[in-house]
Amino acid sequence: MVDGLVGSEMCIRDRFNAKLYAASQTFDEARHVEAFNRYIQTRLKMMYPIGNALKSILDKILTDPRWDLKFIGMQLIIEGLALAAFQSTRELAKDPVLYDMLGLIIRDEARHVTFGVNYLEEFVSTLSEEEKNDRAQFAYEACLLSRERLLSTDVFEYFGWDVEEARQFQLGSDLIQHFQ
């Protein structure tokens, strides 16, 4: 994921400061991956690969040839989802290590989203209505895909559970209700 972030953000046209920010953000993301990896390995001792829903969102974003849609997808959608998920998890965290770690990561993620909003605000003002509608449709479709990323259907299948029954149960859970 970090490689995709670097590649998509280095496509930022002719903005040296934006490229420097993207490099800094890439460092942040690598630090986040390492923090989560260490936390999961030492505290939970169980790790699952990236889920199909999140993978499909990333594939949609990173395979689009237009730099601005990659930027919208990564800076607003993925970073926004991460920010919301980390905030919800932090509110419910009982482990003080996780709570503190998420506080630091949330600070970074909020900065990343703010950068995306500020950078795109200027760019979007140069687009035609048709181009704006195309970007809005892209973002909408990515958001539709993102709904499913909270549902651990890959895990349900792994344990041999009825996927639809487990999905409906999870949709009614306090965590999902809190996140929404």
Task: Outline where the language-model segments fall.
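Single conserved hydrophobic/aromatic residue that forms the stacking wall/gate
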Residues: 1-7, 11-12
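Inter-helical turn/loop segments and adjacent helix faces that build the functional surface
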Residues: 13-18, 43-44, 86-104, 118-134, ...
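Alpha-helical scaffold segments that form or flank carboxylate-/histidine-based iron centers
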Residues: 14-31, 65-71, 96-109, 135-137
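Conserved alpha-helical segments that form or flank metal/cofactor-binding pockets of metalloenzymes
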Residues: 26-49, 116-121
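Acidic/His metal-coordination segments adjacent to aromatic residues that form catalytic metal sites
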Residues: 52-76, 92-93, 141-160
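Alpha-helical membrane segments in multi-pass integral membrane proteins
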Residues: 75-83, 99-116
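Extended, helix-rich structural scaffolds rather than catalytic motifs
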Residues: 129-180
